[in-house]
Amino acid sequence: MSRGSIEIPLRDTDEVIELDFDQLPEGDEVISILKQEHTQLHIWIALALEYYKQGKTEEFVKLLEAARIDGNLDYRDHEKDQMTCLDTLAAYYVQQARKEKNKDNKKDLITQATLLYTMADKIIMYDQNHLLGRACFCLLEGDKMDQADAQFHFVLNQSPNNIPALLGKACISFNKKDYRGALAYYKKALRTNPGCPAEVRLGMGHCFVKLNKLEKARLAFSRALELNSKCVGALVGLAVLELNNKEADSIKNGVQLLSRAYTIDPSNPMVLNHLANHFFFKKDYSKVQHLALHAFHNTEVEAMQAESCYQLARSFHVQEDYDQAFQYYYQATQFASSSFVLPFFGLGQMYIYRGDKENASQCFEKVLKAYPNNYETMKILGSLYAASEDQEKRDIAKGHLKKVTEQYPDDVEAWIELAQILEQTDIQGALSAYGTATRILQEKVQADVPPEILNNVGALHFRLGNLGEAKKYFLASLDRAKAEAEHDEHYYNAISVTTSYNLARLYEAMCEFHEAEKLYKNILREHPNYVDCYLRLGAMARDKGNFYEASDWFKEALQINQDHPDAWSLIGNLHLAKQEWGPGQKKFERILKQPATQSDTYSMLALGNVWLQTLHQPTRDREKEKRHQDRALAIYKQVLRNDAKNLYAANGIGAVLAHKGYFREARDVFAQVREATADISDVWLNLAHIYVEQKQYISAVQMYENCLRKFYKHQNTEVVLYLARALFKCGKLQECKQTLLKARHVAPSDTVLMFNVALVLQRLATSVLKDEKSNLKEVLNAVKELELAHRYFSYLSKVGDKMRFDLALAASEARQCSDLLSQAQYHVARARKQDEEERELRAKQEQEKELLRQKLLKEQEEKRLREKEEQKKLLEQRAQYVEKTKNILMFTGETEATKEKKRGGGGGRRSKKGGEFDEFVNDDTDDDLPVSKKKKRRKGSGSEQEGEEEEGGERKKKRRRRPPKGEEGSEEEETENGPKPKKRRPPRAEKKKAPKPERLPPSMKGKIKSKAIISSSDDSSDEDKLKIADEGHPRNSNSDSDDDERPNRRASSESDSDDNQNKSGSEAGSPRRSGRQESDEDSDSDQPSRKRRRSGSEQSDNESVQSGRSPSGASENENDSRPASPSAESDHESEQGSDNEGSGQGSGNESEPEGSNNEASDRGSEHGSDDSD
């Protein structure tokens, strides 16, 4: 077999037929030869491929179709040839389907390819070439990309460098937006076979573009062009890169590249669309339409068709052929992918032109979804939603426009749109937005503020109650409109009329009715059909009480527009105000009969209110009442069906429920309405009525009062009457009376108020007269009020308002008042008698009180005089004591002189048991103590070193005699245990020199030793007095103890003398230098005397530890005081008195003592004298 021919073996011979490839016969002839010779299948396939290479596709298909049936399979490995035949024919059908533009033909081709591949699967399923072909077929179908991926993957597992599989995987990765993965597959294919066709470089270039590596993409496209100068894809890629540079030279280069591509392939849709886009910016719209239409018809790819339709649509759009533009925009949206939203933007504009804002909004929403922060889209959507009646959409618009103003703060249109949205919900925010727009106009744009904006700002200030600001802006708007009228007189005159009407409304609010009326009439002269002016003039007349004039103005409005609902509503309200329910009902029914206003909410509510009002009139026809309730309820329900948020209808339903007796349900309805808004006074009143019906009078009163404060400024007599009724029902008649009298001040001629005042006066008077505890003044006042009530009822029974209450009831109440007045004299007499009895009783009580007061004054005076006398006696005793002290000092001086003489003569004359010193012992014997003890005593606390001092002299201790047996326990104690130490002043320790101890007599030495041991306790006797006084009872421990206990006490005092000495040094202070010694008439020796002193010392030590204070009246700075000698028994009482006086008063030279100690010593002077003595 030669290279340019093929041999066909003849059946049953060794001969062959040689067919030269350059001279292949017709396909049918070849088929007949092959059939006749029963040729093997692989020869059929080889001949078919040669026909395909020569472009004879029909013969190629015929041969393969015949080979499927007539090919000889009687040889080894024929299955592979059989599979190759089926796959080759299927691959051809797939290729034809990719090129086919007719959808039906394309579908047929795909069906045939599917059938062939299915047959091949049954022969050898996992052949690489079969899997590759099938995978490419799946790629063509588009929705079987995962199957194709799996088959390419299978092939690569068997043959990692299979280039078709690598390219297939690259294609799938690119479509899945895995551009890096796609690029890796392309690179691997290129490394495997560097001689790959240019399309591999083209694929790499697209991957580089998606990865934003534009320079590498440019290199890849350039290399593809080098490999294949007619590669249209590479030319288009380079052209797009050049056009995106947005420079004149680059754009020129890009267009030249597109022109080359167009020359190579005039039917390439990508080239055609890019050229159409170029000519659109060149404003050559005819070429745009020609190229785009040509591109549309030369592609079956929907994305390319969408691009073509978009180019066509916008060329028609810019030429204002909106119907054609709409058609192509719509068609582009049908073909476009989700990421291509430009056709939706154009289609939305077309919907706006057609007035279909709903569809327009949907289109722009799709654009905004793809580009969330697109400025133009947000602005258009904000403007569309701003005009919507749906509050949710208005809120969306507000959000969009706020974003727009944040991105572009100088966009005046966006600020104005935002202000218009905020007008309904946020007046202050709207004013701020208008202010920003005004500032931008004046500063950035250098333009005058339009009169429309000034008028809107004035209207906003009017709504806020800033009437002065509103007037300023209205006048400025009028001036601006007059200035602008030169350019467009008709438009700006219309603005002037609107602003003038707003200014007239402002004058109404400012109570300048004359100015308002003048402006309304001026407008009507120029524009007689301005209905609102007639209505406002009528409303002003109605507010003045001129109902007939108001009716005339409303009828004037009806002459202009016979079906004007506002005019009929105002006339109907006039009838209702005059309680003409029938005519008023007809007016509102007329409004509802008109087709345009058949579901007018206001009229339906008014009708419901008319039926509800009939329920307030007393009637005995229960059926009629129930019928009216059902009608009112049905109307209110209808209103709620039309407008689910209508609060007035809900309030009406609550009122009907209350009339039916469902008070709890009615209260729930009213409560929900009040939660929704607190600006409807009727809801507050209805809630209060419900509280009254439920007997919750306190809550009702609070609700009525809150309603008066919030809505009526305390001047609405109707609400005041409701309040009075609640007070009357809860029994607060006085508050009820005051409330009604306030209402009478507002409406003095109101007969219902007069009736209620009379009724309350009657009830108050009745309660006072029946109360037997009422005094004469209250009874007389009640009779007076009862007479007034009688006059009121008598008057009302003759000239009362029959429509508001029953005159017979007034006459009945008048008779009842008359009956009460006839019984009043009895109550007056009773009260008068009771009053006289009370007066007598009060007089008697006053007299007794006066006597008691005088008695108390007398007792106080006597007490004062008695205290004065006692004080005087104390002063006299003090004087006596001072005198005696002086005498003692003189006597002490003589005694010291005698002592000095005796010392000079020798000490042997003293006797052990008696002598001079047994009769008188001088306690001022610190001079005889050892020096060491004296120093030790100086270390004591300052309170114990203090001495008491008399006004200028030194105090000597007095000798004390043994008291008689008949005295108190303290004196008995002195008899047994020795004298109780008396308070003494400490000596001046620093100025005295210690005398030599050997000069003392032997008897004195023993006493001094004993005295030194107990010296600290002797001075604590005064502290005992303070303790007694503080405790409030006399302390007499010695007198309380029995005779049997005394020896025990003595023994303990002797054994513990050392401890007592330590205690007196540590707890009560350092030991004193002075001591007291007294001779005992019953004892001949010193020893019993010592024991007695120790026992007393121990007791006083313990007491001084408890007290812990320095003696009262002691001076810290007096060092000149000296210890005094004991006085005789005859001086006992004077000393006691002077001691008390001195401790209570203190001398003039002493420092002021603590007040508590002085008071204690004064109080304890009488009780403590026995102990201290």
UniProtKB/Swiss-Prot annotation:
Tissue: Widely expressed.
Keywords, comma-separated and alphabetical: Nucleus, Phosphoprotein, Repeat, TPR repeat, Transcription, Transcription regulation, Wnt signaling pathway
Subcellular location: Nucleus speckle
Start-end of Polar residues biased regions: 1097-1128
Any single GO CC term annotated in Swiss-Prot or TrEMBL for this entry: nuclear speck
Amino acid composition bias (Basic and acidic residues), ranges on this chain: 1023-1034, 1160-1173
Disulfide pairings: none
Sequence ranges of Basic residues compositional bias: 900-912, 980-994
Region feature Disordered, mapped onto this chain: 892-1173
GO biological process, one term: cellular response to lipopolysaccharide
Modified residues (Phosphothreonine): T925
One of the Pfam families matching this protein, by short name: TPR_8
Ranges of the TPR repeats in the UniProt entry: 41-75, 129-162, 163-196, 198-231, 235-268, 306-339, 341-374, 412-444, 451-484, 497-530, 531-564, 566-598, 613-646, 647-680, 681-714, 717-750
Residue ranges, compositional bias (Acidic residues): 917-929
Biased composition, class Low complexity, residue ranges: 1137-1159
UniProt modified residues of type Phosphoserine: S932, S941, S943, S970, S1020, S1021, S1037, S1039, S1041, S1079, S1083, S1085, S1095, S1100
A GO molecular function held by the record: SH2 domain binding
Function noted in UniProt: Component of the PAF1 complex (PAF1C) which has multiple functions during transcription by RNA polymerase II and is implicated in regulation of development and maintenance of embryonic stem cell pluripotency. PAF1C associates with RNA polymerase II through interaction with POLR2A CTD non-phosphorylated and 'Ser-2'- and 'Ser-5'-phosphorylated forms and is involved in transcriptional elongation, acting both independently and synergistically with TCEA1 and in cooperation with the DSIF complex and HTATSF1. PAF1C is required for transcription of Hox and Wnt target genes.
Subunit organization: Component of the PAF1 complex, which consists of CDC73, PAF1, LEO1, CTR9, RTF1 and SKIC8. The PAF1 complex interacts with PHF5A. Interacts with KMT2A/MLL1. Interacts with STAT3. Interacts with SETD5. Interacts with ERCC6.
Name recorded for this polypeptide: RNA polymerase-associated protein CTR9 homolog
Organism placement in taxonomy: Eukaryota, Metazoa, Chordata, Craniata, Vertebrata
Gene this chain is encoded by: Ctr9
